[in-house]
């Protein structure tokens, strides 16, 4: 008799995705982040659900409802901090996952890659709206500043911003709709993630060498299930250390002050995972130019398959490209640091140089380096 997991219509899908899936024998721990992102998403949906049971999306009570969750709800504090820091872990995994894709040439699977870029945008939108919900000072002013950027769009900008706000400023209508969107988006992300996997399983996984692994496959279970469980345990360990020892490490103290439209905080800045993009936005002294650079800083990922000039897929055997990749990582860390600094000398010029370097590396230096490597190998 055939095993039920191979015949049952539902279990057959799960079996082909997580049990009998042929996987390359040499994929490293950099391939763990996909499953970790799935775990992060499930964790965020569950903690978010319990938070939504006690949260009120109203300007008069939002801030105090979050305080109520932390003080009066059984284990409310741990649910709240797991949700807030879970977002940070989510973005750490996202950046690692995208970085892995860039390094090993995973963007050659164009459908998978493009869905991934859409997933990145959707996750960033969700995190932004979630940051507005506690209705602290940074929530309010962050929402005001970021939504205001849309007013830079010619002709329709102002109308668009007022339409998103549901009025002439960030107010009750804005908070209510942001809560509604913040609740629905993770489910859209989950659906997109399934499409992401669907496209991935059409081709199979890439591997560190970038060479076809069809000649050497192993079953996903038990080899990669156990590897994913180890990754998950390490992720949860890191998250719980953050939650239990320094839950406010990555937060902004200004968000413990209730939102006040009459008092602007001295330094308006987003959560740490948006700082690199915020630094690029600020480095251009023109509103529309800044907004375009901000969008392009992430949209540039879609161009990666077109910018790939090397005859090899992976960077594993390309030392010049490796150097440029790690310079890009250092550049992004520099931008993240600059995004959290006030707009004054020398931070302005450092931010501008780092922004130029970011686009220069991706659009010019890396494709040129790949061509040089081809010539060195006489290809």
UniProtKB/Swiss-Prot annotation:
A ubiquinone binds at residue 201. PROSITE patterns: CYTB_CTER, CYTB_NTER. Binds 2 heme b groups non-covalently. GO terms for biological process: mitochondrial electron transport, ubiquinol to cytochrome c. It is found in: Mitochondrion inner membrane. The chain crosses the membrane at residues 33-53, 77-98, 113-133, 178-198, 226-246, 288-308, 320-340, 347-367. Heme b b562 binds at residues 83, 182. Its cofactor is heme b. Keywords: Electron transport, Heme, Iron, Membrane, Metal-binding, Mitochondrion, Mitochondrion inner membrane, Respiratory chain, Transmembrane, Transmembrane helix, Transport, Ubiquinone. It is a multi-pass membrane protein. One of its GO terms (molecular function) is ubiquinol-cytochrome-c reductase activity. One of its GO terms (cellular component) is respiratory chain complex III. InterPro entries: Cyt_b/b6_C, Cyt_b/b6_C_sf, Cyt_b/b6_N, Cytb/b6-like_sf, Cytochrome_b, Cytochrome_b_C_euk/bac, Cytochrome_b_N_euk/bac, Di-haem_cyt_TM. Belongs to the cytochrome b family. The cytochrome bc1 complex contains 11 subunits: 3 respiratory subunits (MT-CYB, CYC1 and UQCRFS1), 2 core proteins (UQCRC1 and UQCRC2) and 6 low-molecular weight proteins (UQCRH/QCR6, UQCRB/QCR7, UQCRQ/QCR8, UQCR10/QCR9, UQCR11/QCR10 and a cleavage product of UQCRFS1). This cytochrome bc1 complex then forms a dimer. Heme 1 (or BL or b562) is low-potential and absorbs at about 562 nm, and heme 2 (or BH or b566) is high-potential and absorbs at about 566 nm. This is Cytochrome b. It comes from Philantomba maxwellii. The gene is MT-CYB.
């Amino acid at each position: 008799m055939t095993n039920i997991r191979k015949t049952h219509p539902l279990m057959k899908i799960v079996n082909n995705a997580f049990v009998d899936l042929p996987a390359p024998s040499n994929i490293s721990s950099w391939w763990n982040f996909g499953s970790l992102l799935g775990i992060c998403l499930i964790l965020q949906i569950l903690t978010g659900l319990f938070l939504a049971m006690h949260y009120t999306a109203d300007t008069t009570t939002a801030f105090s409802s979050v305080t109520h969750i932390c003080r009066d709800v059984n284990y409310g504090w741990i649910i709240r901090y797991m949700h807030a820091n879970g977002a940070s872990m989510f973005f750490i995994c996202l950046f690692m996952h995208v970085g892995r894709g860039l390094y090993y040439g995973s963007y050659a699977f164009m459908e998978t890659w493009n869905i991934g870029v859409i997933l990145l945008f959707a996750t960033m939108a969700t995190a932004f709206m979630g940051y507005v919900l506690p209705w602290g000072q940074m929530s309010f002013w962050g929402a005001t500043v970021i939504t205001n950027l849309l007013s830079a769009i010619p002709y329709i900008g102002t109308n668009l911003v007022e339409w998103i706000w549901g009025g002439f400023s960030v107010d009750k209508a804005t908070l209510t709709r942001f809560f509604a969107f913040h609740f629905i988006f993770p489910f859209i992300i989950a659906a997109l993630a399934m499409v992401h996997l669907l496209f991935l399983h059409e081709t199979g996984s890439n591997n560190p060498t970038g060479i076809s692994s069809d000649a050497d496959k192993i079953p996903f279970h038990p080899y990669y299930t156990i590897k994913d469980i180890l990754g998950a345990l390490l992720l949860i360990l890191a998250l719980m250390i953050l939650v239990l020892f320094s839950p406010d490490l990555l937060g902004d103290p200004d968000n413990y002050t209730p939102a006040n439209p009459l008092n602007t905080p001295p330094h308006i800045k987003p959560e740490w995972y948006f700082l690199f993009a915020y630094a690029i936005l600020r480095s251009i002294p023109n509103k529309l130019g800044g907004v375009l650079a901000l969008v392009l800083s992430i949209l540039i990922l879609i161009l990666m398959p077109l910018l790939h000039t090397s005859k090899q897929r992976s960077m594993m055997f390309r030392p010049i490209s490796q150097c440029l990749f790690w310079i890009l990582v250092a550049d992004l860390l520099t931008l993240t640091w600059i995004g959290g600094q006030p707009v004054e000398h020398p931070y302005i010029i450092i931010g501008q140089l780092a922004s130029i370097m970011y686009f220069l590396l991706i659009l010019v230096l890396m494709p040129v380096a790949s061509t040089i490597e081809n010539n060195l190998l006489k290809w």
